[in-house]
Amino acid sequence: MDILKKSLFLILFLGLVSISFCDGEKRQDDDEANESEEKKEIHEVEKRLRPAILVRTKGKGK
């Protein structure tokens, strides 16, 4: 009976550890996805603002 308790405890412990690793990897993937979305948004803003910046810098160079 004692062996069954220990083995059950070991199985549950290993299951929890593997779940925590999976959650950690999922969080990293989500963070990477969020970073790539932020980079896309920044790139879109730069695209919109680039013509205005170029016009201002050309005007100051005259």
UniProtKB/Swiss-Prot annotation:
Residues 1-24 form the signal peptide. It comes from the Eukaryota. It is found in: Secreted. The modification Lysine amide is found at K58. Coiled coil: none annotated. GO terms for biological process: defense response. Pfam families: FSAP_sig_propep. InterPro entries: Frog_antimicrobial_propeptide. Keywords: Amidation, Amphibian defense peptide, Cleavage on pair of basic residues, Secreted, Signal. One of its GO terms (cellular component) is extracellular region. Expressed by the skin glands. Residues 25-46 form a propeptide. Belongs to the frog skin active peptide (FSAP) family. Induces contraction of smooth muscle in isolated rat urinary bladder with an EC(50) value of 2.2nM. This is Sauvatide. The lineage of its organism: Eukaryota, Metazoa, Chordata, Craniata, Vertebrata.
